[in-house]
């Protein structure tokens, strides 16, 4: 997009003033409107901006595992995800989860295992989300 080659053109495409865009870029504006973050991510083909907003600015998103706003290489991200999906790890998590939930009650002694499972799932969510961001960026020509 040729408009994105200048701050004025980008500001016009975003529907903000050039000075507002400069304030966003320089961190002067403390709360960037979420609709502008979404629009910037789409215009700049930078889905990682959405991840950054959710992990850094959104009070709800801060409490959930989110992909990093700093994208690694596709190779590194894929290997990280595949490492977490090793068959023996998945089987162990599956067996523990069955044991914990089979009776419909989570006892005190099962809580440690459940916390480990939740941490494992958080890592999986984060790795899958990072690969998704890289894929979205690649599919949109980035």
Outline where the language-model segments fall:
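Acidic, glycine-anchored loop motifs typical of Ca2+
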Residues: 69-76, 88-113
């Amino acid at each position: 997009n040729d408009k994105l080659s200048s701050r004025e053109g980008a500001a016009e495409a975003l529907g903000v003033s050039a000075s507002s865009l400069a304030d966003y870029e320089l961190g002067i504006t403390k709360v960037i409107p979420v609709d502008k973050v979404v629009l910037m991510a789409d215009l700049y083909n930078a889905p990682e901006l959405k991840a950054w907003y959710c992990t850094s600015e959104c009070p709800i998103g801060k409490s959930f595992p989110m992909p990093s706003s700093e994208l690694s290489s596709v190779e590194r991200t894929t290997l990280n995800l595949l490492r977490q999906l090793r068959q023996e790890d998945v089987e162990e998590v599956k067996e523990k989860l069955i044991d914990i939930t089979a009776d419909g009650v989570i006892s005190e002694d099962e809580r440690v295992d459940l916390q480990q499972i939740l941490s494992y799932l958080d890592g999986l969510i984060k790795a899958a989300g990072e690969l998704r961001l890289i894929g979205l960026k690649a599919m949109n020509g980035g």
